[in-house]
């Protein structure tokens, strides 16, 4: 049944970059069914809030976003004016991890949301939204522990009833970019097979399922055609990519192919599991031209007893050895990690071990989190809980240390040359990220351009007649720092951004055929 009426929808995305990809897939599904995407929720008929359910703060942000969207209504609700003439949205719908994780419980406790939909609803999202606007009750998602659901891996799935996407076929992914800019996120897999004691993600994201290399490469080409210059490869655990494809070295084979995609100047892989960092993978990551010499390693702690209680492996010595081997391959390495303080049973000596590790590790960026119970996890049932006030003191201590160490790490780059992907040009300055910096996560780099520039909105004309514009890869020399941010002086343009190629949007028939190809539809 067609839902092709003129409807306007606003998408609000919270949480991680994986959620951003899910929102872009939802936008493509809705656009293929005739929905108009608007940026202002007050102008929409329906507001779709892609929620995060990872930690308490993220859950609160998601609920606040749903309440804020509800507050934009003019009192009509789903039964308001059918033509959308009234101000404010007529429907507020929750999707994403919070909706998947809590489903009916969220719907009962938050009546401001007209529907709460799980991942399995994504392929038919347009139909569900149309039903909500028509006043038809849409059952709330009933959560299931996806750890108990064994996926049909790509190796065993039946082939789709259309030719598989491949490089240079012109296949258009079911995705619509929602933000302009030269950096694009590319999801290579979904779910996780690890069972860390503190993490609830596998319970609602499910087991690890890799996308096929052809699908990933086809989407990479499409993103390049949309103006992307850097690809950030995301998943719940990127080091597991390919194990369900029957090839433990699938990522090592895929990475050089992605780096060779025309128009792409940098590929960055994030969410790496230290316990799965094989020497051969480390070498590919850090020596392949076009791959950022960058490691995003989730250490979580450095004390072996704490790590064992977390159901994780390694320790300070193992992690320092891994970093030493990485720097032997790439002396300019950028390395970031996250750590948790206050895990049940953590002692003052454990915190000292973590601090000593951080002092020796020379990381460029570190996220520090205080432990909190997540229902349904093993850690929530552990004894020897640390009082909240002590967790906060430990978090402040480690955060203060990290700020000093990462600033010193940035200072150590003064005098070095960096390659910066330009994201903005204004006022004689080009801003972007060097190879050791993940956009919006690790700080950035401000490049001073030569005098004699053009208008503030760029591109900036240099004294030598060059142009620096968004998407250009430039070389610069670091001359100063501000915290973890670098200040550099322009040297040369290394690779210019090409004009963005026109890429067709999916037609409704094509979009329908592609339903299920993406990872965001419940796998």
UniProtKB/Swiss-Prot annotation:
The keyword Metal-binding is assigned to this record: yes
Domain named Radical SAM core: residues: 178-409
Annotated HAMAP family: MTTase_RimO (MF_01865)
Cofactor: [4Fe-4S] cluster
Protein name: Ribosomal protein uS12 methylthiotransferase RimO
Binding site for [4Fe-4S] cluster 2: 192, 196, 199
Residue ranges of every copy of the MTTase N-terminal domain listed in the record: 7-134
Source organism (scientific name): Frankia casuarinae (strain DSM 45818 / CECT 9043 / HFP020203 / CcI3)
Function: Catalyzes the methylthiolation of an aspartic acid residue of ribosomal protein uS12.
Subcellular location: Cytoplasm
Sequence similarity: Belongs to the methylthiotransferase family. RimO subfamily.
Database matches in Pfam families: Radical_SAM, TRAM_2, UPF0004
CDD domains reported in the protein's UniProt record: Radical_SAM (cd01335)
């Amino acid at each position: 049944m067609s839902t092709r009426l003129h409807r306007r929808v606003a998408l609000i995305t919270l949480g991680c970059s994986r959620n951003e990809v899910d929102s872009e897939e939802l936008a493509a599904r809705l656009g293929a069914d005739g929905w108009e995407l608007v940026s202002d929720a007050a102008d929409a008929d329906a507001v779709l809030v892609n929620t995060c359910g990872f930690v308490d703060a993220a859950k609160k942000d998601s609920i606040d976003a749903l309440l804020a969207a509800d507050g934009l209504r003019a009192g009509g609700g789903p039964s308001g004016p059918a033509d959308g003439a009234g101000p404010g949205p007529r429907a507020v719908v929750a999707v994403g991890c919070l909706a998947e994780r809590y489903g009916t419980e969220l719907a009962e406790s938050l009546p401001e949301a007209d529907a709460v939909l799980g991942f399995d609803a994504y392929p038919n999202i347009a139909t569900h939204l149309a039903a909500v606007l028509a006043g038809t009750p849409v059952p709330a998602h009933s959560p299931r522990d996806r750890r108990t659901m064994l996926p049909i891996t790509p190796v065993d799935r039946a082939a789709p009833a259309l030719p598989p996407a491949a490089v240079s076929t012109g296949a258009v992914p079911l995705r619509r970019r929602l933000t302009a800019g030269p950096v694009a996120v590319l999801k290579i897999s979904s779910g996780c097979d690890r069972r860390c004691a503190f993490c609830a993600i596998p319970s609602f994201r499910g087991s690890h399922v890799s996308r096929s290399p052809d699908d990933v490469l086809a989407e990479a080409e499409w993103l390049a055609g949309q103006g992307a210059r850097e690809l950030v490869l995301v998943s719940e655990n990127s080091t597991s990519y390919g194990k369900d494809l029957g090839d433990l070295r699938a990522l090592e084979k895929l990475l050089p192919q992605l780096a060779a995609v025309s128009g792409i100047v940098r590929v960055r892989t994030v969410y790496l599991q230290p316990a799965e960092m094989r020497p051969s993978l480390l070498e590919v990551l850090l020596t392949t031209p076009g791959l950022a010499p960058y490691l995003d390693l989730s250490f979580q702690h450095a004390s072996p007893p704490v790590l064992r209680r977390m159901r994780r492996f390694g320790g300070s010595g193992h992690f320092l050895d891994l970093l030493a081997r990485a720097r032997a391959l790439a002396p300019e390495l950028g390395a970031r990690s996250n750590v948790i303080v206050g895990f049940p049973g953590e002692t003052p000596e454990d915190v000292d071990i973590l601090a000593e590790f951080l002092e020796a590790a020379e990381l460029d960026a570190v996220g520090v989190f205080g432990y909190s119970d997540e229902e349904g996890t093993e850690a929530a049932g552990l004894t020897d809980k640390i009082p909240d006030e002590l967790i906060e003191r430990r978090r402040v201590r480690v955060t203060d240390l990290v700020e000093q160490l990462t600033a010193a790490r940035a200072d150590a780059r003064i005098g070095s040359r960096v390659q910066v992907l330009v994201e903005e040009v204004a006022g004689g300055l080009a801003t972007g990220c060097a190879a050791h910096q993940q956009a919006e996560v690790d700080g950035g780099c401000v490049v001073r351009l030569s005098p004699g520039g053009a208008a503030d909105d760029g591109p900036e004309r240099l004294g030598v007649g060059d142009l620096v514009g968004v998407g250009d890869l430039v070389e610069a020399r670091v001359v100063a720092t501000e915290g973890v941010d670098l200040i550099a002086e322009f040297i040369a343009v290394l690779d210019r951004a090409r004009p963005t190629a026109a890429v067709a949007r999916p037609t409704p028939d094509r979009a329908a055929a592609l339903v299920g190809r993406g990872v965001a539809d419940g796998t």
